[in-house]
Amino acid sequence: MCCGVLLWLTVYYRKKNAKKFRHGAEYGTARWGGPKDIAPFINADFSQNLLLTDTERLTLGQIADPEKRNVNLNVLVLGGSGSGKTRYHIKPNLLQMNASYVCSDPKGTVVEEVGQVLIKKGHYKLKILNTIDFSASMHYNPFHYLHSETDILSLVTVIMANTQSKEKGGDDFWQQATALLLQALIAYIYYEAPEEEKNFAMLLDMLNACECREGDENFKSPVDLLFDKLAKREPDHFAVKQYTKFRQAAGKTLKSILISCSAALAPFDIQEVRDMMAYDEMELEKLGDEKIALFCIVSDVDPTFNFLSAMLYSQMFNVLCDRALKVYHGRLPVHVTCLFDEFANQKIPNWEHLVSVIRSRNISAHIVLQTYSQLKGMYKDNAETIAGCCSTMLFLGGKEESSLKMVST
């Protein structure tokens, strides 16, 4: 009997202190995923998927497995020139016709190839912003999407981010002073001008009417008189407060600020651009309500007018996020897929924050780049944050070092 008890204690002790070994897995268990791994993310209805490869796709609906629902639909696409980013990713996803689309279209070839299919087969409304041939563009008026002082600040931020020199140093003062003047003028137009004058043509006319004289501190330009009149009526008016801050500079400095501001807005002063921005046809607020395909045709050679698409994207996200919360209590009824081909062509301010929150509003973004270094060059330290907000990365090939490191880690 004693031998039996001793044997039992020996077996019990060994089991209690036994180490768990996974034989054959001494160097890790990482492996390539297979059909069973991707299956929970795929919708049985092929048309309700986001396409990645011939065998991999993601459902636009809710993932069946609750433990896997932390996956978002943001995609980072990396591929060198000629790797098929447009042919094998942008176009196939457009032809799924399962969402509203916002598609950047360098050279304007994508809308030519899929536009009629979207209209006839998907019953889409087509919207086109053409910054290569303004006469072929629909009208876009940023003033149409201003509803508050915050919107005014956001509009000025995107203008400054895409029209000012990227050099550092003494530029900060001039940028801040230029921003104050733009905020004051835009606020005055938004709150005080009649509806037909709420556009960039009026902003340019007011800027051209601004004047200061170095030897005469008491000189009043027509714009000064407008703000003086408004200050007497509403001293706490947002436009008055911003203009007062701008006017605190000395005469010579004011003149330099006016020159800086005029230089920043010079691309708007072309008659074709003035005409295109006279009124609005884009209906950005409806992208999440019904099926609309918006194509932004931008030059991949001359970046002069790329700020127009950046301005539109920035306002679109603000409008859609507000509408999702205020009208639909969280999520838009129609998914909005943003296909940003050649994403480095323009800069969207605060993008590192926007890309992290749009998922909850039923919006997704496909950030398409030739190299990862393009993202780092544009967004600096925020590049990793932006990449981290994309649950999926699609690599189509390339030799650039930062892209290869991104894929291998």
Identify the function of each model-found stretch.
Residues L58, P66-I363, M378, K399, ...:
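P-loop NTPase motor domains
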